[in-house]
Amino acid sequence: KTMILTSNGQNIYPEEIEAKLNNMPFVMESLIVERDGKLVALVCPDYEAMDSYGVSNRDLPMAMEEVRNNLNKMLAPYEQITRIQLYPNEFEKTPKRSIKRYLYDN
């Protein structure tokens, strides 16, 4: 199991946050990474869901900010996501269909 250790000693399990985030509107898949001591969500948008709800690419940043706010309401203070970074394509996967995390850690 993957774990992120914060500077104040908190253990964060990104898969638990990703499971919540992947159930949010317009999120196809996600990956939680640490960047400069803060948690960032890498998100591949669900473009089909966006189309069916009439959400354009121009509206996407605002929609993702709403997703981030709703997600943070479900998380402990030390698990808060500071920003969402959009990825246009699905993440690279292993043959077992799990995301190759090491490719996105930097």
Give residue spans per PLM region:
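AMP-binding/adenylate-forming catalytic core of the ANL superfamily
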Residues: 1-78
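Conserved C-terminal "lid"/linker of ANL adenylate-forming enzymes
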Residues: 29, 37, 66-106
